[in-house]
Amino acid sequence: MNLSQTDAVDWLSTLKASSVDLLITDPPYESLEKHRKIGTTTRLKVSKSSSNQWFDIFPNSRFEELLTEIYRVLKNNSHFYLFCDQETMFFIKPIAEKVGFKFWKPIIWDKVCIGMGYHYRARHEYILFFEKGKRKLNNLSTPDILTYKRVYRGYPTEKPVDLLEVLVTQSSNQGELIVDPFFGSGSTLIAANNLKRKVKGNDISPAAHEHFEQRQKSHSMQIHK
């Protein structure tokens, strides 16, 4: 497992072209700022100050350079998954298509528990499913609604490892390289490692690295090279 702590786009630019088998990520997208200002999301849990200690927002203005780098580093015939909300989905989709990706569909993560808010309170999140070239999913019977209860073990945007294992299993094989440029709580890294994939991850936040280091220790992770 190879981890870095720098800007996501800068880090991706250091990876070789067509070297990555699968990329899964959950960037701290711009609309999160709106939610944490008005306190309508349990993803940010306590307060604006408590979420600020974990991550800085990645602005919409930088998504084209990010997606361009993601497309460059992915091998032909590979998949790319990005977690986001509805507002960000409408923004990202045309940019991803512009840089070369085929957009298949939004997969729904059903969190089981309802979130905070005022108008039809959300209990789901989107996982945008993109493809570079053409790659068959490993299990064609998997539905597009994935139901896994939301977890919170100290990191505000943590994803269930079981959920990430579905994506890793669907779009990669043992020994292939999985990359996450915004690894956050580290769930993607753990899922990939559990399934004996190679892993490279990056997050600019010192708090994310500290959290993941403690998570590794508490789970006594056996790192697969």
Predicted regions and their residues:
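Core catalytic lobe of class I
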Residues: 1-210
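Short, conserved SAM-binding/catalytic segment
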Residues: 213-225
